[in-house]
Amino acid sequence: MSNKAWGGRFEVQPEEWVDDFNASITFDQTLIDQDIEGSIAHATMLANQGIISQQDSEQIIQGLKSIQHDYHQDQIQFSASLEDIHLNIEHELIKRIGDAGGKLHTGRSRNDQVATDMHLYTKKQVQDIIALIKSLQSVIVDIASNNVDTIMPGYTHLQRAQPISFAHHIMTYFWMLQRDQQRFEDSLKRIDINPLGAAALSGTTYPIDRHETTALLNFGSLYENSLDAVSDRDYIIETLHNISLTMVHLSRFAEEIIFWSTDEAKFITLSDAFSTGSSIMPQKKNPDMAELIRGKVGRTTGHLMSMLMTLKGLPLAYNKDMQEDKEGLFDAVHTIKGSLRIFEGMIQTMTINKERLNQTVKEDFSNATELADYLVTKNIPFRTAHEIVGKIVLECIQQGHYLLDVPLSTYQQHHSSIDADIYDYLQPENCLKRRQSYGSTGQSSVKQQLDVAKQLLSQ
């Protein structure tokens, strides 16, 4: 007798190397807890519907729980010849409890079984990711709250542009992560759907109760179409997209961390605990954790592209191609969870060099817009003011000084309306104070922003 669940149809058994190519047990055993959870719900429902006896159901459930326990105690070795987690568990169950174990698969296919596992797994992982995002956001808010008055240069095109609050800058990433969190939250509506009972593709002739398994597995709803239930992998693509976009945001943040920690910037100092050294250059302290996070975006985005291409042109119901949905998702989940934890620890332990930041904005032309705005208050059209300030900046560059160093007489040569109050006007801290529009970098506006963020975190 063949050891294959489908062996009755075949005269020749696959060779071992073919089994190895076909098998997924090396990675889909990740789903063991979800597979057993789904099977317990299925066995419970079968008994309640009178499809199998209560005694058989109880034997099955106890057998499944013993397999789960022994697996986590490293007491079970699964076989590639049994292909996947589903058939390995069924084989072990029959070995332990006898013929009753063979009744578990009544009214069920591996098609709806694996779909159920993947929905349960993805739901749990997305909930974990949301919690990790919120935890990172909380650290960002703490850092921002302590740096409302810390001034730094804001950049466009990686050129110094205008002075901004460090709190305002870092809170940008709070809002990126907030959108990420919202996307994950919204996706749960499309993940939290029960496919169990769809069987291979057309449902089953047994009098099953899909609403019961939906309740037992804490799903929010169930698929209305059995063929859609076993064909759908949209939720995996959506999860991979949300992971990839969150990783892109972490990568952008990581790039700033890397730049800020350079000797050229010296805006922050990373903790030794989140840095590494060089095997040849003893002075080096490298921001490897930030660089790794930046690099891992290619990995998660690659998994997204791979899954999109796997589904492209795929016929309905289950096709073996769908086995390829797992490794990419598992790896992407592992990657983002690790990246979020690392990022939280990295920024929580970094030192913000406030004096360096505050001094930096006094050694550039990031207050040039303020000079133009000052001229506008003297009833000079902004475009004319822009031209005047551009000429003043050019002279400063040629003479090697900054706007706060320009003598009043020189200013007045460019326009007679410039008074001695210009020096106070151009101070970086005053540049921030004047920016009070909603969502701007002024202190009162940033504090308002922080209040909104804290309220969101408390929900």
UniProtKB/Swiss-Prot annotation:
This is Argininosuccinate lyase. HAMAP family: Arg_succ_lyase. Belongs to the lyase 1 family. Argininosuccinate lyase subfamily. InterPro entries: Arg_succ_lyase_C, Argininosuccinate_lyase, Fumarase/histidase_N, Fumarate_lyase_CS, Fumarate_lyase_fam, Fumarate_lyase_N, L-Aspartase-like. GO terms for cellular component: cytosol. Its EC number is 4.3.2.1. PROSITE patterns: FUMARATE_LYASES. It is found in: Cytoplasm. Pathway: Amino-acid biosynthesis; L-arginine biosynthesis; L-arginine from L-ornithine and carbamoyl phosphate: step 3/3. Keywords: Amino-acid biosynthesis, Arginine biosynthesis, Cytoplasm, Lyase. It is an enzyme of class 4 (lyase). It comes from Staphylococcus aureus (strain MRSA252). One of its GO terms (biological process) is arginine biosynthetic process via ornithine. The gene is argH. GO terms for molecular function: argininosuccinate lyase activity. Its main location: cytoplasm. NCBIfam families: argH. The keyword Lyase applies. It catalyses: 2-(N(omega)-L-arginino)succinate = fumarate + L-arginine.
